[in-house]
Amino acid sequence: MNILEVSHIDVSYGKSRVISDLSLTVSSGSRTVILGRNGVGKTTLLKSLVGILPISAGSVVFDGSDVAKQKPYQRSLSGIGYVPQGREIIPLLTVNENLELGSLGRPKLRFEEKKAWALDYFPMLKAHLNRNGGVLSGGLQQQLALARCIICEPKMMLLDEPTEGIQPNVVAEIAETLKRIAAETGITILLVEQNLKFARKVAENYFIMQKGTVVASGLTDGLDDETIRKYLSV
């Protein structure tokens, strides 16, 4: 079953079209990476899926419903979680307050219970609950952003460059944690990533973008050197 079906979408910044006639499908519970050189529209695609940028043509169907005209908060309530590039935690709020922000809009959510559940995946945060997010290392900030995303148990997580500016040992931990989250919760993961080693470790499937559209796709195990040279080498 597909949780996400994107059909022939266009996305523009003013008069400049960035995404053109792009289509892709993502299976429920899968782990998928979007690859491509800088400037091909990967971040723009994620922003259009979460509703930050409007699409000018095509359709976006999430969990059986057309969400193309929904606002970002409506897509969030429908089950789309998002961790943007740069993490965008609130630096003057504590770790605990940042996590509580993730639960806003969910009146039936028992915050302390869900916080304990989320921290089980990111236990390093437990020692920092009363520290401001802005003083944490990049690795801890990324873990906080991911914990804040999963605290409401989204159906799908959109992650934009989750390894950016993070030490290799923390990158490896995040890779294993994302795989564990997907396996134990059934949350679908769709990420944009430049780190090919990380992408291969986390994702089962890939899409490659070039000039604002998808030009290749398949299983990450089958991503060969020729395809990498053609579409990803600088």
Give short role names for the model-derived ranges.
Residues 149-150:
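ABC ATPase C-loop
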Residues 14, 70, 95-113, 121-123, ...:
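ABC-type ATPase nucleotide-binding domains, specifically the catalytic core motifs of the NBD
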Residues 132-136:
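Conserved ABC ATPase signature
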Residues 172-185:
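Helical segment within the ABC ATPase nucleotide-binding domain
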Residues 58-66, 78, 111-115, 131, ...:
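Conserved ABC transporter NBD signature motif
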Residues 50:
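Helix-to-loop junction immediately C-terminal to a conserved catalytic motif
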Residues 35-37:
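The feature captures the beta-strand-to-loop junction immediately N-terminal to the Walker
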